Amino acid sequence: FARTLIQVHYHARMGGVSVVMSRYARAFEQLRGRGPGANIVVCSPDQVRQRLPWPSVTRVDLPECAYRAFRSGASFDRVRARLRRRLEEVCDDPGHAGPICVVGHNLTLGKNLALTAAFADVARERGDVNFVSVVHDLAEEGRIDMLRRLRSVERWEPGIRRLMYPTLPNYRYVVLNRRLHRLFGAAGLDTGLLFNPVASRVTPDGGWISRDRLWEALAVTARRDGVLLDRAKPVVFYPVRILGRKNVAEAVLVACLLGGANLLVGGPGSSARDRRFMERLLTLCVRRGLPALFDVERARRRLGRDVGGGRMFPHLYHFADVCISTAVTEGFGYALYEPWAYGKAVRGRVPAGFSFQGGIDGGGLYRVLPVPIEWIDAARLERNYYRYINECFPGQWDGATFEDFREAFERTVITKGLIDFAMLDQDGQLAVLDRLAAAGNVAEPRMVRRAWGGRVPAGPEDTFDDRGRIDRNRRRVLRNLSGAAFRRAFQRQVLRGRPSRHGHHVDTGVFMKYFHTVQQIRLLQASGTAVAPGRKGRKIPA
């Protein structure tokens, strides 16, 4: 199998894809052993030219890999040519012994379509090298900015969709979940299914930070925000960045209001929109006295070297009484798997289209958190969805009026006067959260039954789950989703994988057809700028 692994991504900032890249690199190093070869990551330097904290990895900084939109065909062609030339140079480096495997992460998402095109160009020219496109997410899931970029680039590169999904004898796709595996199969793309590796070594270098010391650091950080954490309450940890699709307002509702617990959450995403939402959510929590700490890794400054060389998340897993996940969509869903490795139960929501891998028992999670429709401005919500769906999927439907859409929307997503909290936009979610907090959460027992299975935590020692299930899931995560099991799957799907068929008919339109319905789309999946005014005369099916 491959002696040189070259991973290509937009950046190496903290996040889910970077975690996957680091664990791919570690697995490759363990499989390769000694001898010639190389372990390479190609990405933009971003703000900091830091040394990658991964074993035996050489970083190749290529600024053109960064996120970018293009205003002209000339700029697109110029960046594409530069990227193609640099990727060829990395492949041709005499120190990079063959066979070579080049892995592109999320290049179908559209965050830099010149990088996507250059990756396909080099794959077409270098038949002696294996290329693997690892797909974590799809633009078609409702990522408006990515869809806009794709439509813009199509004006001067009409074949960009074929470059996103080429069919070549040395080009293969790998996806992270069964839903994407089914969709790629329906599109006619030769695709492997490879779960993401879950951490198997749970004790950080230097051991665990003491509970008292960690609690003090968290409490001081929270007080600087105007938030008072309550040591008498359980601690719930949501190990994600604050992004729209992570549905963090629901985590506040479930943990702080319905569960009577403290909540710890990671920092905001990289967009101004994510940071603004975190600030609005924090303002509400301060005003209503909700014990939620956002951007929790700031507490690291008060712990110094005690954290060791890694992130705080392992210490927070160990510290928390229970973990939560409320995301509306997930590529893999580390927050639904990794807590079990630390002996902690996971509560919250099952993402749309999600199914657990590795034999994990996901009992205790809900699929819908009902909210009375009279609590929100339903007409405003319907118009926002109408604009959003038309912006994401223009031309998908024949003519109909907004009234037709409203009828389909109400028939599909409103049941007995209730709507799922995750169907709301962020404004609607904050309004509901504020209403419940102001009322002292006495108005809606149905939400408690959905969120916690009929009960709230009794105290800090309450695991919200039976110990038998926690132990079983911990064993299954460590046996099936990490270590040797992952290395075997990684070797089969990535390092040795080649297409079983290519050059056949491919129809990636199935992605649009699947995601353009009211059942699949969520306003929380929007990213970047506001939704443009919708177009009239579109028929939007239920």
Name each region found by the language model.
Residues 1-51, 97, 123-129, 484-491, ...:
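N-terminal subdomain of nucleotide-sugar transferases
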Residues 13-14, 31-83, 109, 271-272:
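N-terminal strand-loop element at the rim of the active site
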Residues 46-47, 179-180, 194-209, 511:
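Short beta-strand->alpha-helix junction loop in the catalytic core
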Residues 121, 139, 149-172:
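Membrane-proximal helix-turn-helix segments that form the acceptor-binding/catalytic region
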Residues 233, 275-316, 322, 361-375:
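Nucleotide-activated donor-binding/catalytic signature segment of Leloir-type glycosyltransferases, i.e.
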Residues 328:
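Aromatic "clamp/platform" in nucleotide-sugar-dependent glycosyltransferases that forms part
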